[in-house]
């Protein structure tokens, strides 16, 4: 039996994993099936953390000033520090975008945020994805204080891999045992 012939229904796969009576001795099982099951379990566990962090981030971007001042969540308190990082990094660009938004409030604004790349000693270039995502979160938070509809800017400017690195950073910092 190959992994392509296996039933991909999530609940059935998890039932198979947790119901030890239907699992044969692992020594005789096809290693690709075992790998497929292990990958599925790891993705499921990882997805639950990732979706929780994204939910916290989305909630943070929609919070008003009173809610932010009264929060006890350490993750949200950290997110609040990203605004100053964005101001330091983007400077006048923040003011220019806010001016455009005030000037034409009903228009959809395309906001492209730049990344500074650093040259390594091996003559290659790199961008620290965690720091970039922090600055974008701060930028979006500033925009949302004016009008809370600009969360799309985060997802338009940040690649999946960069967001994944940021989620890993938050998981490591706050969810490690």
From Swiss-Prot:
It is found in: Host nucleus. Disulfide bonds: none annotated. GO terms for biological process: symbiont-mediated suppression of host cytoplasmic pattern recognition receptor signaling pathway via inhibition of IRF3 activity. Transmembrane segments: none annotated. The keyword Chaperone does not apply. Induction: Expressed in the early phase of the viral replicative cycle. Keywords: Early protein, Host nucleus, Host-virus interaction, Inhibition of host innate immune response by virus, Inhibition of host IRF3 by virus, Inhibition of host RLR pathway by virus, Viral immunoevasion. One of its GO terms (cellular component) is host cell nucleus. Plays a role in the inhibition of host innate immune response. Within the host nucleus, inhibits activation of interferon-beta promoter by inhibiting IRF3 activation. Belongs to the poxviridae OPG036 family. This is Protein OPG036. It comes from Monkeypox virus. The gene is OPG036.
